[in-house]
């Protein structure tokens, strides 16, 4: 049918303006027909028609969105012709529609189910014409939405013929909505509309992970496992498209607690997590900064941290970006409630405020709180439950592989500029630096650099750099080894000075009893290293005073080559209260649990217990603490050897402490003249002739003297003139009650 000229008019009713139809008088066209409206030779628009008596014959009425789309003005003359669809090619298979609230004042954050929307759309607009770029108004759940047709695909012609689908889909500009057309809704850019359900397009999401990051660039070494665990627990759900997460009913992890010894990379890891993510810059807060002298200000500071996240969630709902808040030293503000002295309860209300913000009545799903501490025991337990800081990750001392990575990172610049000597073997350094934290390894590299630089400084009246030699500056293996020996000692390692004083005179193997003690000690060391069934091995060396128990314990510890050796000795706790003693002992054991292999020597147990026979008196608090620590197994994957020493086995028996040790080894005194002569020969203080004289007096006789006391007597007698030495030594032996020696 040839076209006719008609005049554009305003849509007569609001109801008709929601129908997406052009409205005519029934004298002109019939309801349900389709027309092509031509506004110029190159601009054609297809509309479906409805009739209404209030429209003047010769006029065609359009709604405001239709007039906008077709560029029509009221009263404009346009050419209108009937249009018929080719059902084989122009039935809509799928149509993508951009959706947003029609009026900004009606915005809300309620979720809208796209499946229900699609069903309503097909019902309202069945058998209607749609074109790419068309604008229309859609009413759903008493809300008005503005729609824009983005893309149309024709239905597979095979389906229309009742045959199996051929999989061919063709893009078309104009199509007809039929009962089995599919509609996919796409949220308009910057819209706060919250769409749920399957009938929505997959949004072009920016990955939250930065594409160009790697561990070495981040300066993190030795934390691969920890990082992958954090990623699995905290970020895996955020990488997936929101619609899949929504279908699973999955909630994102909101909090991570990183804990472990100082200098192992907690702060570094948290800082780099922020860089790894394509999120906004994280807010980094030092725990004590939150506190304020004014009432209520501390709580307000917590609220300010979460204000941006709350505002964005209110505006964008599920599509809000990720907000990261990092609390360094979180134990400063999140101590156990009720543990702080004073009547103000400021700390308690700060904890309460933080608890309610992370997971309170109004839940935020767009935050990630990272807390760091080396005292996780101080933190309120309500903060550690799932839904709050639920991922608890220990950032412990790096193993050999981790130390290798860390040293690689800290020497990378030197290697790049050829300042690292060829004789430096990073693998060797990684083996030698047992129980070094990341910060201590960085300190080692710094110390080696300063040693190398020091070689090129002229030692004169002025401090000058020898520029000729400075050009050839190289950090050598010797620099690293010197720094390892003199400058950097690991906090959780073995300080040789601790036990060197106990074995400064060496171990005098005066007989089988000493050899047996050392052999048994070696067996226990091997058991600790190799046995999976006994991660905790404890041994008590008991014997009379001055028999060398502490020296033997220190020797067994030294020979073990464990990376962590500590001596818990009463001489370091002089004047301590009972509570302070318990805390000092607990700290030594807690530090030991952080190392893969540890040895703790508990020296002179009866002195630790404040035992005196008069009364008798002892500290029950220290006794109970020690009993618990002796029996407590180390964490999984860690092994601990405890060596105790005592001169009062009978007292420990009464206190029921002997049962706390796996085994007991007796360390005897020198008991025979032959053993005494063997000890004198090994010490080498007396000449052969002098020893022969002593032998005549002691051979075949019983003696009873500790090796420590023997050393003291020998040193005293050596202060005499040579001819009186032997006489003095034998006299001292007799005075000590070592034996009833008869001599002239």
UniProtKB/Swiss-Prot annotation:
Taxonomic source organism: Mus musculus
Job of this protein: Required for vesicle-mediated transport. Catalyzes the fusion of transport vesicles within the Golgi cisternae. Is also required for transport from the endoplasmic reticulum to the Golgi stack. Seems to function as a fusion protein required for the delivery of cargo proteins to all compartments of the Golgi stack GRIA2 leads to influence GRIA2 membrane cycling.
Example GO molecular function: protein-containing complex binding
Reaction equation(s) it catalyzes: ATP + H2O = ADP + phosphate + H(+)
Subunit structure: Homohexamer. Interacts with GABARAP and GABARAPL2. Interacts with GRIA2. Interacts with PLK2, leading to disrupt the interaction with GRIA2. Interacts with MUSK; may regulate MUSK endocytosis and activity. Interacts with CDK16.
Cofactor note (record): Binds 1 Mg(2+) ion per subunit.
Positions of modified residues (Phosphotyrosine): 259
Database matches in CDD domains: RecA-like_NSF-SEC18_r1-like
Residues that hold Mg(2+) according to the record: 550
Subcellular location(s) of the protein: Cytoplasm
UniProt similarity note: Belongs to the AAA ATPase family.
Protein name (database record): Vesicle-fusing ATPase
Pfam families per record: AAA, AAA_lid_3, CDC48_2, CDC48_N, NSF_ATPase_lid
PTM comment text: Phosphorylation at Ser-569 interferes with homohexamerization.
Modified residues (Phosphoserine): 207, 569
Enzyme Commission number, as recorded: 3.6.4.6
Source superkingdom: Eukaryota
GO biological process: intracellular protein transport; positive regulation of protein catabolic process; positive regulation of receptor recycling; potassium ion transport; SNARE complex disassembly
EC class name: hydrolase
InterPro entries assigned: AAA+_ATPase (IPR003593), AAA_lid_3 (IPR041569), Asp_de-COase-like_dom_sf (IPR009010), ATPase_AAA_core (IPR003959), ATPase_AAA_CS (IPR003960), Cdc48_dom2 (IPR004201), CDC48_domain_2-like_sf (IPR029067), CDC4_N-term_subdom (IPR003338)
Binding site residues for ATP: 505-510, 545-552
UniProt keyword terms in alphabetical order: Acetylation, ATP-binding, Cytoplasm, Hydrolase, Magnesium, Metal-binding, Nucleotide-binding, Phosphoprotein, Protein transport, Repeat, Transport
One cellular component term from this protein's GO annotations in UniProt: cytosol
Chief location of this protein within or outside the cell: cytoplasm
